UniProtKB/Swiss-Prot annotation:
<keyword id="KW-0862">Zinc</keyword>
<feature type="compositionally biased region" description="Basic and acidic residues">
    <location>
        <begin position="283"/>
        <end position="294"/>
    </location>
</feature>
<feature type="zinc finger region" description="C2H2-type 2">
    <location>
        <begin position="231"/>
        <end position="253"/>
    </location>
</feature>
<keyword id="KW-0479">Metal-binding</keyword>
<dbReference type="GO" id="GO:0045892">
    <property type="term" value="P:negative regulation of DNA-templated transcription"/>
</dbReference>
<comment type="function">
    <text>May function as a growth suppressor or tumor suppressor in liver cells and in certain neurons.</text>
</comment>
<feature type="zinc finger region" description="C2H2-type 1; atypical">
    <location>
        <begin position="203"/>
        <end position="223"/>
    </location>
</feature>
<feature type="compositionally biased region" description="Basic residues">
    <location>
        <begin position="1"/>
        <end position="12"/>
    </location>
</feature>
<keyword id="KW-0963">Cytoplasm</keyword>
<dbReference type="GO" id="GO:0030154">
    <property type="term" value="P:cell differentiation"/>
</dbReference>
<keyword id="KW-0539">Nucleus</keyword>
<keyword id="KW-0677">Repeat</keyword>
<dbReference type="GO" id="GO:0003677">
    <property type="term" value="F:DNA binding"/>
</dbReference>
<dbReference type="InterPro" id="IPR036236">
    <property type="entry name" value="Znf_C2H2_sf"/>
</dbReference>
<keyword id="KW-0863">Zinc-finger</keyword>
<dbReference type="InterPro" id="IPR042972">
    <property type="entry name" value="INSM1/2"/>
</dbReference>
<dbReference type="GO" id="GO:0008270">
    <property type="term" value="F:zinc ion binding"/>
</dbReference>
Amino acid sequence: MPRGFLVKRTKRSGSSYRARPVEPLFPPPGPLAAQSSPEEPGRGLLGSPCLAPPQDDAEWGAGGGDGPGPSPARPAGPELRRAFLERCLRSPVSAESFPSATAFCSAAPAAVTSGEELVPPQVPVSVPIPVPGPAPHGLQRRGKGAPVCASAPAAVRKPKAVRRLSFADEVTTSPVLGLKIKEEEPGAPARALGGVRTPLGEFICQLCKHQYADPFALAQHRCSRIVRVEYRCPECDKVFSCPANLASHRRWHKPRPTPACAASKPPHAPLTPPDPSLATGKENGRVPRTDDQHPQAPDSSGDGQHRDSAARPGLQALVYPEAARPQAPYPEVILGRHGPGSSGASAGATSEVFVCPYCHKKFRRQAYLRKHLGTHETGSARAPTPGFGSERTAPLTFACPLCGAHFPSADIREKHRLWHAVREELLLPALVGAPSEAGPGGASDGSAQQIFSCKYCPSTFFSSPGLTRHINKCHPSESRQVLLLQMPLRPGC
């Protein structure tokens, strides 16, 4: 809040209420005033004490006599008049209303010395205009000299108020990422001055200076000076709005060579050279990703690669038998490992292929093939396809010495032999004195008890409904023929 905002505006001066010694306004007429004039010529102007020595009746005599006056009512004495004037001058109201009482007091004796009678004032005398001079300290603070002092800061602030902001767009970078502002053409219309206001209803683009009738049209306006900056990847044609994003993206295109991949890549180069415009071996390239992007770990069983080279033609053609090999739980022939370039289909591949000997599925890793072989072990005993031949299938699997069924592992074969032992114990009383069984799926021609054997597995049942339930549950119709092809006819026990 500014200083003096709530101060009551009056004409009162800022002088204090302290009474100052002043000269008496009306010195006594007569010889006393005449005597004081020659003795003290400058006392009336400089000011003197207002209280004079008491002189009662000598002042009012016509000829200066001591007798009483002719009037029956004695006029007021000079002391009473002086006390009245002093009381009026000492009051706060008169001190504030008449700040120039000193000048009035100094001018009054000069008028009285001419010999006029003293008359008490009936009407308040108008305040004379004070002569400009050194004002009191209080008046200097609150006087009208304050605007003079404030004019110096106003002169300093004047250039700031006069300064006009220039809105000419010299910036060529947009705050929106990926946008750039073109430089203004020399022939473009200049913008109106800051003092000139555009009429209402006109909306002007600040860049191209086009005017529109409503703000919606201005918002939909596509300025010709705003250009979209695109940073395109030279290898995959992806577009980015920031060069840093493009640099981060291009790191994915860097090749990832490994010593093993570099050693095996020259002999297995592709037959047709790739297009030089397309990126090869890139993760985001348009060509299909090859296996070199994530090279396989070197196989620890690579020492037997040349040893299997003679077996590959037999496995691919499925016609020629293979030489016998020592039996093992998972021999290398079962894994069906094929090196690169073993056939026309795998000529372009740079990784090894592992073929399952039962279903001829191909796998890239040996671990995948081992996991797949576990699915063949879960079912009943199954032999390879007849195309392999009995000579070829014997060393590949574990054959049952009783019925000739082949199994991929010794554990499954032992379970199968347990079925033979249980069946012999059950059928021994019924087969005593009876001829041999008619066939694998028939019933024995013996006496009371009849035996039903499954055609697809070595399971045996004593009733036809039990065999039917077993066939419907364990050998569904879609896989019966496949199982029949894989399962050779076994001789009767």
